[in-house]
Every structure is written in C-alpha cells, then in structure tokens.
From Swiss-Prot:
Subunit structure: Homodimer; may form tetramers and higher multimers.
Manganese listed as a keyword: no
Gene Ontology cellular-component terms listed: cytosol
Molecular-function annotations in GO: 2 iron, 2 sulfur cluster binding; iron ion binding
PROSITE patterns: HESB
Protein name stated in the entry: Iron-binding protein IscA
Gene: iscA
Cofactor note: Binds 2 iron ions per dimer. The dimer may bind additional iron ions.
Keywords: Iron, Metal-binding
Organism: Salmonella newport (strain SL254)
Record carries keyword Magnesium: no
Amino acid sequence: MSITLSDSAAARVNIFLANRGKGFGLRLGVRTSGCSGMAYVLEFVDEPMAEDTVFEDKGVKVVVDGKSLQFLDGTQLDFVKEGLNEGFKFSNPNVKDECGCGESFHV
C-alpha cells in the first residue's frame, strides 16, 4: 500500500505547512459526493488518529484513514499549473470512471 507525491506536490505542501506554522502533515481521504459517487478530501492534520495509516514521501507525511485507504492505494498526488489555474491533481489507479466536470469519481 502506498501514497506518493510528485516533487511539485511535496514542495507545495511544505510551503502550506510552513505558512500555517504547525501541522503533522496532510490528510488525504474520500467522501461521498457528486454524480459519480466519491470526491477527494485534502486537509491539514495536527495529530494522526490511532486507526490512521501514515505514509511519508519526499519529507511529507500523508495521513489516510482506513476506510479511504482502499480507494486511494497507489495514488500519486501532483501539483500542476495549467494557464492561470493551479492545484492538486490525483492520479488514482483505482478510478474506473469520473464525472464530466472532474469533481467526483467511481471505483
């Protein structure tokens, strides 16, 4: 089981954590949402819970709850700039289909 980050994603997360002034790492999860069923959740975590799995890649700790891990195993988190837009992009090998707007997915 693994979650990885691109160099640009790791750099951006480290900038956010430094600006925030505290934090253990980044929580990655999924929630029920959208027309395809699931959406990604990204948030800072100050203290992982006992049932969490913690991955570390490029100096960034990524925390995933047990329920989300089955849907996220093998995912790479990237940070991309496309024109004037920038943001995190998920490359998840478990995704079978995405909605047209790209906001939700199905595994």
